[in-house]
A protein has these predicted regions:
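Structural signal for conserved beta-strand scaffold positions within catalytic alpha/beta enzyme cores
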Residues: 41, 119, 146-149
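Short beta-alpha junction loops
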Residues: 121-126
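A short helix->loop->beta-strand "cap" motif at the edges of active sites that frequently abuts
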Residues: 113-116, 141
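Short, surface-exposed alpha-helical segments at coil->helix boundaries
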Residues: 25, 29, 100, 128-133, ...
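Substrate-binding/catalytic groove segments of enzymes
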Residues: 97-101, 142-143
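Glycine-rich phosphate/pyrophosphate-binding loop and the adjoining helix
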Residues: 143-167
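N-terminal beta1-alpha1-beta2 submodule of the flavodoxin-like/Rossmannoid cofactor-binding fold
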Residues: 4-86, 90, 97-99, 108, ...
Length: 167
């Protein structure tokens, strides 16, 4: 179930994701399916265009945001209430070896107290690096587990095995 601020939780597990190209979205949807989790998309107030994501152009929006760690892009759409969730997966692409700055906006504006948080990322070649640790530090609350990088083509069976390995 895709959640907004007024939705009632149907599960004690939530998959939160940010995706510009659909790769992370696909993994998040499969993860929600195998865990029975609710699903929430972090939507930027100003959507990213293909030009914004051109990694070969140092003047693009995404490059500028990543070059300035203090940048906090605004989140649009409805917010999500984390009350009632005990396990939260947070998925995102890796941009220039790090989490996109909009993830910083999200974790700094939510309370993860008494939550187990599992970061996951998608990337064409980079690993998860320190992004999960960076987000945990910014959040300041929650029990953040070691995250993992998944390919966009990861199967539900592979995701199930990963989830089981977290226990």
């Amino acid at each position: 179930m895709l959640l907004g601020v007024s939705a009632l939780a149907e599960s004690d597990t939530l998959v939160i994701y940010f995706s510009c190209t659909g790769t992370t979205k696909g993994v998040a949807e499969r993860l929600a399916s195998v865990t029975g989790a609710d699903l929430y998309e972090i939507v930027p107030a100003v959507p990213y265009t293909a030009e914004d994501l051109n990694y070969n152009d140092r003047s693009t929006r995404a490059t500028s945001e990543q070059d300035h760690p203090e940048t906090r892009p605004e989140i649009g759409g409805e917010d999500v209430d984390l009350t009632g969730y005990s396990t939260i997966y947070i998925g995102y692409p890796i941009w220039w070896g790090e989490e996109p700055r909009i993830l910083c906006t999200f974790v700094e504006s939510h309370d993860f107290t008494d939550k187990t948080v599992i970061p996951f990322c998608t990337s064409g070649g980079s690993g998860i690096g320190r992004s999960g640790d960076d987000l945990a530090k910014l959040a300041g609350t929650g029990n953040w587990l070691k995250g993992a990088r998944h390919s966009g083509s990861i199967s539900e069976n592979e995701l199930s095995a990963w989830v089981e390995g977290l226990k």
